[in-house]
């Protein structure tokens, strides 16, 4: 058997990880970031690396800060801007600042440092102008007042936040009391006085000449809801004008054409209890008196990222598509869609360059993210960077037929051995998502190296198969998504290299919900792992970080019909519950109630000694995903031990560091 990094968790964590991509306006330089473990193996540290656009020379490291660098952006003159935390004698834990690395050489220098840090930056393509996002406290009239007030809060150990609206937290962090602003970096000027919630989760772009900014701008909606509009902000005066608004949709991801003449963005309609939202591509010319139109309305895919070709002639987008994530070009005038890539990869961080060239990162279940160049003739060239790890098995694709006749496709990993392997059904999160790209956190090859075949299906609600495929499961999570998963499992069990008599199911987030639902509706699996899973839907819909979004689908009737907690008495399969306390998307209360219900009301309750086959892996300081290296390692150790115990009848090997 071939030894690979997936046979050893430490070796797996040692693999360098590529993320992000930036290309200079003239296309002559390409920069990415690579993350590696620190010496204590408790944190990933990211550095900037320059790539050879021709694909011949090895990558060259640009930065070596102890705390790392991220978010590279090129200026019009070819300098590289980036975010970095760099301690000083006066402050050993400063927030992230914006730094500039000159194109002509020399040391990087600090460009913008603010008391609350800098979150992101965008530079104009044709002028030495940069706009950055950074937070300010609402009662601070300027940056200096913000600095004083932050120091007062710190010195007095005050962390209290007085909210007047919603939301109050996001994913794993509290919102407030500071609010995101946009700053003209060169002038040191705040462009967005008193924005309130408007720039939370906002994206923005700067015109090529730097004269204006277009940003997504959140406005209040009835109740606790909000929606996203688009505004144009004059960089000199700060005057803000709403240029696109739709009461029935969120308008997001604005991107200005390289010649400054037009704007592209996405429109996501608000869902209802019966109908899922839909994401479409939109376009407007700045001289058209504010009129904007949807583009390619008959194209049955959701754009996930939008940019422009370097000559501003077409839009370059990515979208999930049948278990892949290709690159497409779209004619903004006719709506004609052309697929530019034809492989099994998913493309991200797409950066068009002059001459019709496109740089991007791509990944699949055969390779982690790696940089590539797409030429106009369709040729794809890998840019030397990090060698892809050897895989511990094979990847195949299978298709099942759902109860209603709909095809349900899946990826299936198989161990090297030709002996039939036990099967793990792994359900993706979202639920609006797809198993179509490499995951460092949810990695099937670690289980495959351990001897398991891993099934990764895209059931109803998955993206990349059209609007009707999503609608099949909308408001009915326990119906078509569940039966699709069972059909996919049946198809995998028919594979000659799968042992159908030894199976388990697992998933995270929505996948955790499905694991909980599966546990109460079938006893076909020997073990079930539920990570950050939804358990009591009526409880979840009121306590999640963005309750107004979920409330559109989760009516009282929907939650009653689809809530897994109603079937706890039918659960006769050992369950491993995993949850992080800092998870605000699926709050810890879901796991706490599930754990109590399993021990008291399931078909496998705790005995008179308080013992049961169920387990609860709790992370006090982790979030929705459990991201730190040391806790990722324990996650896989506990999961494989639990699977081995109940699927293979092997003694559980609990990590010693758990005490």
Name every feature range the model reports, one short phrase each.
Residues 15-30, 66-81, 108, 113-129, ...:
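Conserved beta-propeller blade repeats
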Residues 40-45, 89-95, 173-178, 222-228, ...:
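Short, solvent-exposed loop/turn segments at conserved positions within beta-propeller repeat blades
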Residues 45-46, 135-183, 228, 279-280, ...:
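Predominantly five- to eight-bladed beta-propeller fold
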Residues 52-55, 102-106, 186-187, 234-238, ...:
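Short loop/turn segments that connect beta-strands within beta-propeller blades
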Residues 79-142:
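Hydrophobic or amphipathic alpha-helical targeting/insertion segments
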Residues 386-495, 499-501, 508, 540-542:
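Cap/lid segment of the alpha/beta-hydrolase catalytic domain
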Residues 459-659:
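Active-site-proximal cap/loop segments of hydrolase catalytic domains
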